Amino acid sequence: MFKVRVIPCLDVKDGRVVKGINFVDLRDAGDPVEAAIAYDAAGADELCFLDITATHENRGIMLDVVRRTAEACFMPLTVGGGVRTVDDIKVLLRSGADKVSINSAAVSRREFVKEAAEKFGDQCIVVAIDAKRVKRGGGGERWEIFTHGGRNSTGIDAIEYAQEVVSLGAGEILLTSMDRDGTRQGFDIPLTSAIADSVHVPVIASGGVGTLDHLVDGIRNGHATAVLAASIFHFGEFTIRQAKDHMVRAGLPMRLDP
């Protein structure tokens, strides 16, 4: 049986972590490499870096962060933000990223997913989906894709889009509920399960974690294969080990370091 993954996420701007981190053993809470080393030592299964500056002028800074993290850490790294071309993916992988996350560029040019998967293998291509619940014209609701940090509505159905990008070669979906992100009310379980049940690749649930039970819920009821969280770990509310122990007690298969 697959092991459930617990994945902390770091938002990076101009080479610095922009959301506060409260690890007591960090010398510099704004240094993403130090934060990554702490998460690696704590037993995180993977780490997600999101370059929220996401401009080519800042790419060199992020590449240095990825390179230094890869040299210091054993856990796999997923890096996203501003990835628009095959060359962007190439330099991130060469710098030490294990997987690269594509978001807005995949929405505007679907064939980019296919090109990336064919060149680098689907195992390292993650498509990030930011979805929000919207009203249908004739009544009812659906989940719609938003891009550019949630500012731009696309009118694209999230479930249909997930199926399409997987058919083009996406090896994993990073699914964020914009309705739940930052609320600490738990994952959007109907959204997560709808996407996870519609594709044959792993789905990472993201957005809304406030308790350890929320992590369990994302796997058990959301049918995700991994859970991503930020603030509950960054602010020292829970440790990675506490999260994993809680999930083990709930009957989920976890990788536990000795």
Curated annotation (Swiss-Prot):
What the entry lists under Gene3D superfamilies is as follows: Aldolase class I
- The answer to whether the entry has keyword Amino-acid biosynthesis is yes
Please give the superkingdom of this protein's source: Bacteria
One CC-aspect GO term? cytoplasm
Do the record's keywords include Cytoplasm?
yes
Q: Extract one GO BP annotation from the record.
A: L-histidine biosynthetic process
In short, the EC number is 4.3.2.10
Q: Which GO terms describe its molecular function?
A: imidazoleglycerol-phosphate synthase activity; lyase activity
Q: In which pathway does it act?
A: Amino-acid biosynthesis; L-histidine biosynthesis; L-histidine from 5-phospho-alpha-D-ribose 1-diphosphate: step 5/9
What keywords is this UniProt entry annotated with? Amino-acid biosynthesis, Cytoplasm, Histidine biosynthesis, Lyase
- Which residues of this protein are catalytic? D11, D130
Compartment(s) of residence: Cytoplasm
Substrates-to-products reaction catalysed = 5-[(5-phospho-1-deoxy-D-ribulos-1-ylimino)methylamino]-1-(5-phospho-beta-D-ribosyl)imidazole-4-carboxamide + L-glutamine = D-erythro-1-(imidazol-4-yl)glycerol 3-phosphate + 5-amino-1-(5-phospho-beta-D-ribosyl)imidazole-4-carboxamide + L-glutamate + H(+)
Q: Which family does it belong to?
A: Belongs to the HisA/HisF family.
Q: What does this protein do?
A: IGPS catalyzes the conversion of PRFAR and glutamine to IGP, AICAR and glutamate. The HisF subunit catalyzes the cyclization activity that produces IGP and AICAR from PRFAR using the ammonia provided by the HisH subunit.
Report quaternary structure and partners: Heterodimer of HisH and HisF.
What is the designated name of this protein?
Imidazole glycerol phosphate synthase subunit HisF
